[in-house]
């Protein structure tokens, strides 16, 4: 009996002491949290030169640009709510001017089975931008086009089409003044890799194939009005505003990968240390 009680006690103490130890940063968690107290968030970019295959590409890019402006403040709000940072600021720079100024190159990558676009930015321009805004690091978020193979099922789940589909994806990095990438999205430090897309630009037209008694299912692009309606679907935020459901899915995923380490009771793991230190002063 004493042995069982002791084992349970040791397990409980271990959970209280270590919590969930997973680190999603490219540096040790404690180093990141000490280094990045004030985070700047650049206005969300759209990379019109990426793999966006929609026949009305210009209209689509303009639509994304408009929705970036409408929703980017919610990303800042969600990052603030993590409690990881002392302050999170949305930079006031113009996204269309800032992106080409900062961009060094883009690479199509396939890492650990995840296809994505990785962005590289000019160190000197980044250093200047951070100094101008008085932030410790900056988060750079880019909406881009990406084509990847998928198996998509019909609404009745009886048929599927495995093909290459064009998507709107989101890539992001948190970079310091020395140009070091401290955190990135997609994030390869997850136990189970996941990389949700912002929006599927194409769909398999099962209904047309059925209507024409055909086994040939065409892959079609969604219309601009249809895409606009999808982006316009809103949900309430924790504040008084609203955010597009599409963006909220991505923002929530990003914010979850920047949560501070928690103890068993849901508090920050370092809260006890901070309170103890304050009491000794």
Residue ranges and their predicted role:
Residues 21-35, 40, 49, 148-151, ...:
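C-terminal/domain-edge helix-coil "capping" segments
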Residues 44-47, 142-148:
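Generic short beta-strand segments
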Residues 54-145, 175-195, 200:
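N-terminal segment of the mature soluble domain
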Residues 25, 119-126, 153-159:
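N-terminal post-signal-peptidase region of extra-cytosolic proteins
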Residues 58-61, 154-162:
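Short helix/strand-bridging catalytic loops that position acidic/His residues to coordinate divalent metals
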Residues 1-9:
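Bacterial N-terminal signal peptides that target proteins for export
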């Amino acid at each position: 009996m004493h042995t069982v009680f002791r084992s349970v006690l040791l397990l409980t103490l271990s959970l209280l002491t270590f919590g969930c130890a997973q680190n999603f940063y490219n540096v040790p968690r404690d180093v990141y949290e000490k280094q990045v107290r004030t985070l700047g968030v650049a206005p969300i970019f759209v990379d019109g030169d990426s793999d966006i295959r929609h026949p009305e590409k210009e209209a689509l890019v303009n639509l994304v640009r408009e929705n970036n402006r409408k929703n980017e403040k919610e990303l800042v709000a969600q990052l603030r709510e993590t409690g990881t940072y002392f302050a999170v600021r949305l930079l006031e720079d113009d996204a269309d001017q800032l992106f080409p100024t900062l961009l060094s190159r883009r690479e199509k990558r396939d890492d650990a089975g995840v296809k994505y676009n990785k962005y590289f930015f000019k160190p000197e321009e980044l250093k200047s931008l951070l100094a101008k805004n008085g932030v410790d690091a900056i988060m750079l978020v880019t909406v881009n086009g990406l084509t990847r193979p998928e198996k998509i099922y019909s609404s009745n789940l009886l048929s599927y089409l495995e093909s290459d589909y064009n998507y709107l994806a989101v890539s992001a990095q948190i970079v310091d003044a020395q140009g070091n990438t401290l955190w990135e999205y997609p994030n390869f430090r997850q136990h189970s890799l996941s990389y949700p897309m912002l929006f599927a630009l194409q769909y398999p037209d099962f209904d047309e194939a059925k209507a024409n008694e055909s086994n040939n299912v065409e892959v079609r692009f969604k219309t601009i009005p249809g895409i606009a309606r999808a982006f316009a679907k809103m949900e309430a935020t924790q504040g008084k505003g609203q955010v597009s459901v599409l963006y909220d899915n991505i923002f929530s995923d990003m914010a979850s990968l920047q949560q501070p380490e928690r103890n068993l009771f849901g508090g920050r793991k370092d809260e006890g240390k901070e309170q103890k230190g304050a009491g000794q002063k």
